[in-house]
């Protein structure tokens, strides 16, 4: 096998640039889904059930995209066609979802419309997101993978900065942040429109700038039979042959993604309770809290961007991973005890450290362990299960846990903190990868 060539910084940048737009869409979804469905009339104890759809679509779509793209060799590339189709569908659905309450439908009908829109949005975002991870695995050598995934993490978090702050920014510019009962405010609707436009522009940029290898070049650099990926291999067989690192990192992922599922689900209700002292979803205070969630997630992304730049400086990647999760766990744990909206920025900066590590480090560990394996795209799609399954489990248990902690959404932040610390403990089973 010939060593993969070192790529210039800008080639590494171009591989992941479209992730910036995809992450804007993902940020708008993660910051506003609880707000949207609560505004439509969902009960807080049932709110987590709406969050089952995003990871469920991920666990179904991403392995399929990985498997199909392993077998795809066309004039437009191997991974790029899936990226472009997913982004196009996402743009269309982003124009529909925030209007779920604007078509004069009954509450139940609006909920169903919102759920169907959310299902298609999740499907398309996952379809657009997975190719970026596979492009790095395909074209970047071991020595540069940490840098490549750190760039991806930087772009991902930069996209989050933009997506999270949109509703707050539009409200500041005079766009209405209140609406009749059951209707989503214009500040949220316009945010989705602008996010959709940026998404398609970013994906077009990556499509034009990235030239994937042909089958012969891929085989030359990846020590894999170009026909091997075309042979059928069921997922059970692949999982049985998966490297040990796949499962060890997966255990860490279990705790981490469950923690962040509770953050996305309950942050709006938490700060509405602790800062604005309201649980009325039709009140101006609740909608202000919804905007401030975006601001806090903005600062979380700032923390992630800064920490992502620091992560490559650590010589011991295992230590960096565990440290990041502990810092994030502390951030979660102190959220319920802060009643000032400005001071809440601090714990979300800390939470951003964990997020940066979660985006960059698991895939660096796993893609290094997959060197020489056929069906690499399928493996990365299956590894996405370590992101999706924990979220599904957390969403299914969310209402029950909320009852256990006194029906105060703020207490779910403490639960999230404990989960991250458990994830840090699980890092002990991981070995640091060998660098070329």
Placement of each model-derived feature along the sequence:
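Loop-to-transmembrane helix entry/capping segments in MFS-fold secondary transporters
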Residues: 44-45, 142-154, 373-383
């Amino acid at each position: 096998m010939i060593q993969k060539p070192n790529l210039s910084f800008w080639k590494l940048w171009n591989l992941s640039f479209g992730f910036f737009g995809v992450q804007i869409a993902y940020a708008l979804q993660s910051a506003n889904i609880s707000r949207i469905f609560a505004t439509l009339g969902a009960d807080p104890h049932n709110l987590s059930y709406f969050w089952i759809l995003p990871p469920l679509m991920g666990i179904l779509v991403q392995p399929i995209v990985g498997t199909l793209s392993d077998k795809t060799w066309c004039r437009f590339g191997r991974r790029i066609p899936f990226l472009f189709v997913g982004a196009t569908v996402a743009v269309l659905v982003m124009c529909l979802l925030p209007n779920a309450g604007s078509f004069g439908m009954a509450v139940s009908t609006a909920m169903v419309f919102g759920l169907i829109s959310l299902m298609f949005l999740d499907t398309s975002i996952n379809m657009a997101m997975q190719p970026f991870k596979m492009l790095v695995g395909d074209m970047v050598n071991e020595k540069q993978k940490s840098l490549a995934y750190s760039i991806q993490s930087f772009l991902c978090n930069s996209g989050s900065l933009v997506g999270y702050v949109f509703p707050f920014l539009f409200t500041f510019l005079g766009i209405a942040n209140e609406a009749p009962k059951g209707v989503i405010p214009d500040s949220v609707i316009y945010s989705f429109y602008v996010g959709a436009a940026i998404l398609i522009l970013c994906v077009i940029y990556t499509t034009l700038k990235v030239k994937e290898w042909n089958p012969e070049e891929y085989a030359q650099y990846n020590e894999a039979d170009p026909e091997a990926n075309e042979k059928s291999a069921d997922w059970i067989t692949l999982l049985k042959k998966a490297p040990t690192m796949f499962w060890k990192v997966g255990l860490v992922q279990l705790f981490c993604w469950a923690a962040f599922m509770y953050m996305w689900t309950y942050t709006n209700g938490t700060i509405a309770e602790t800062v604005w002292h309201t649980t009325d979803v039709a009140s101006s205070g609740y909608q202000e809290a919804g905007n401030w969630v975006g601001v806090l997630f903005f600062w979380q992304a700032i923390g992630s961007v800064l920490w992502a730049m620091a992560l490559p400086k650590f010589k011991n990647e295992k230590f960096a991973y565990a440290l990041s999760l502990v810092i994030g766990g502390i951030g979660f744990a102190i959220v319920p005890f802060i009643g000032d909206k400005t001071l809440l920025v601090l714990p979300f900066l800390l939470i951003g450290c964990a997020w940066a590590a979660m985006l960059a480090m698991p895939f660096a560990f796993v893609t290094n362990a997959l060197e020489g394996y056929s069906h690499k795209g399928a493996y990365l799609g299956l590894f996405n299960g370590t992101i999706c399954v924990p979220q599904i489990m957390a969403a299914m248990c969310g209402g029950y846990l909320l009852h256990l902690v006194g029906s105060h959404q703020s207490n779910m932040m403490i639960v999230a903190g404990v989960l991250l610390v458990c994830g840090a403990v699980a890092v002990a089973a991981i070995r640091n990868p060998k660098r070329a």
